[in-house]
Amino acid sequence: MEFSVKSGSPEKQRSACIVVGVFEPRRLSPVAEQLDKISDGYISSLLRRGDLEGKPGQMLLLHQVPGVLSERVLLVGCGKERELGERQYKEIIQKTISTLNETGSMEAVCFLTELHVKGRDTYWKVRQAVEATKDGLYTFDQFKSVKPETRRPLRKLVFNVPTRRELNLGEKAITHGLAIASGVKASKDLGNMPPNIANPAYLASQARRLADDYETVSTKIIGEQEMEKLGMTSYLAVGRGSKNESMMSIIEYKGNPESEAKPIVLVGKGLTFDSGGISLKPGEGMDEMKYDMCGAASVFGTMKALAKLNLPINVIGVLAGCENMPGSNAYRPGDILTTMSGQTVEVLNTDAEGRLVLCDALTYVERFEPDCVVDVATLTGACVIALGHHISGVISNHNPLSHELVNASEQASDRAWRLPMADEYHEQLKSPFADMANIGGRPAGTITAGCFLSKFAKKYNWAHLDIAGTAWKSGAAKGSTGRPVSMLVQFLLNRSGQETEE
């Protein structure tokens, strides 16, 4: 779909359809008022008749409105004006796109970007409209023998901005939104791919393809043989029960090759399937453990968006690919592993494997002398209990970095919340036989997992994102969400000095 911005009067738009908002109860938005005035009260007379109340998501398609050049006008219910928030705005955009497709519109001019959304500017409204549109149109049906027929005639969508001086901002919002949407789609596709296909080697192949597509990207793959030489014993232990080789993919993006600035490093947990190993998970819902690689998928999606945007910064993405399976060679509860850092870990539960992969990856990235490291992982069920399915968890050893990430999450409407990491929590990880245990008991499970990782991130500024509750949805809407690609790209936009506000 083609997106663009313009600034003009609604009645003068020569388009198949123009889209304007109506608030509850039957209150016209400023743009709808303009059309009503031009049409001698035609729209308000329909509302008085009860054709549209203005409740969120209500739609009314009008034909041949007097004085209006557009063939059709789509009235969109936006709820109560003062209650129009971010979530409702995005839902309204998606419902609008669905209605435009259902009614056969090939092009439309959308004035919903002129609505007032509390605390949000034109850039945000246009970018979120692009992201929401792309997200609403996403499908994953490549494994269906008979593909569902969906009517999608809409090819061109124009967002109207209030003034001409906002056109550049709107165009930038579209550029950013399309790149982020592309990254989100790439992340979703990886997450939704079945585990018999999306194994660590598949992750590596996608990383190589990214390098083939962009001159600014290069890729290095580290297999088990090299891991053994590097002393990545903890990482290797997790994958021992699987016939699929563990592979770590290093994606290097050089947007500013002349710069001497230290790179930003993103590390993604890539458990392409997590059975729990010897500490086997319950059978119910185990199919969703293909999503245990969504951390790596989100890092991949972020790197793709970054390459599309051609940002002038240097970033390294690490996809820590592995599969946790039971088997005669699998690691066991009671094993003591010597990590790449030299620290030892007593394994109390083989289903707490993500941290055992990440700890060696975090040690490996020391060689890049990073400005900062952000790891992303579907790490703990405890995070779902703490924050539900709406907000990702943040744990960090560096206050400014955690503030940057939380701020980026607010800007991108991909929210995260910082959790504490006090010294007392480290007590739960004590082991009588090794330097630490790999679990710290039931209390504060997300925090103790973060504390574990922090022991391997002492040589740089580090933050951990626990996306166990936000990486995918269950039930009727089952599938990967692509989060937190939007947040990570926003973080990198901010780091590269890209202005995203008026």
Swiss-Prot record:
Gene Ontology cellular component terms for the protein in this record: cytoplasm
Active site residues per record: K281, R355
Q: Which Gene3D superfamilies match?
A: Leucine Aminopeptidase, subunit E, domain 1, Zn peptidases
Question: Main EC class of this protein?
Answer: hydrolase
Q: Does the keyword Translocase apply?
A: no
Per the record, the major location class is cytoplasm
Q: Name one Pfam family in it.
A: Peptidase_M17
In the record's cofactor note, how is the cofactor described as bound?
Binds 2 manganese ions per subunit.
- PROSITE patterns xref list: CYTOSOL_AP (PS00631)
Give EC number(s), comma-separated.
Answer: 3.4.11.1, 3.4.11.10
Q: Which cofactor does it need?
A: Mn(2+)
State whether keyword NADP applies.
Answer: no
Q: Which residues form the signal peptide?
A: none
* Protein's cellular compartments: Cytoplasm
Q: Which UniProt keywords apply?
A: Aminopeptidase, Cytoplasm, Hydrolase, Manganese, Metal-binding, Protease
Q: Which GO terms describe its biological process?
A: proteolysis
Q: Which residues bind Mn(2+) 1?
A: D274, D351, E353
Q: Which NCBIfam families match?
A: PRK00913.1-1 (NF002072), PRK00913.1-2 (NF002073), PRK00913.1-4 (NF002074)
Physiological role? Presumably involved in the processing and regular turnover of intracellular proteins. Catalyzes the removal of unsubstituted N-terminal amino acids from various peptides.
In which family does this protein belong, per the annotation? Belongs to the peptidase M17 family.
Classification via HAMAP family: Cytosol_peptidase_M17
Protein name, please?
A: Probable cytosol aminopeptidase
Annotated organism of origin: Vibrio campbellii (strain ATCC BAA-1116)
